[in-house]
Amino acid sequence: NSIAPGFPAIFGTWPFVSDLRTGAMSGGSGEQALLSAGCAQMHRFYNLPGGAAAGIADAKLPDMQAGWEQATSNVMAGLSGLNMVYEAAGMHASLLGFCLESLILGNDLIGQALRCVRGIEVTEDTVSLDVIRATCLDGPGHYLGSEQTLNLMQTEYLSLIHI
């Protein structure tokens, strides 16, 4: 695209971090998430769509460590504006293992990451000073019965997967 503008191209980056103590790959590290975010910045600089790895866990099993590592890097990838994410779900042991159950967990995790990327919409309707006034000053003191709350539950709250 830099040579011939308009020519379709995807900037495929694949940075990996090594544990400096052992030399082993550390796909679930915070540094890996930072490198993927840095790749997104390069993609924007060159005005090309691109991808990088995120969602990899160093953990060998779908446990808390795996969830933490996968969530951190997937949210970082989303917030940095990465166009494509390789290995976004299911990958363990720094790409040496794969877990089908982690695909299910990853689906929920990626949904939460995408919700973070969407951000908070601030408009006259979403600030809802009239609803705040009616609830806090004249009403029950909570929003659980509010029509607006019931409507927003469908778009603003992502529930856990029910299996």
Where are these regions (language model features)?
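Glycine-rich anion/phosphate-binding loop at the beta-strand->alpha-helix junction
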Residues: 1-109
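Catalytic-core signal marking the mid-to-C-terminal active-site face
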Residues: 101-161
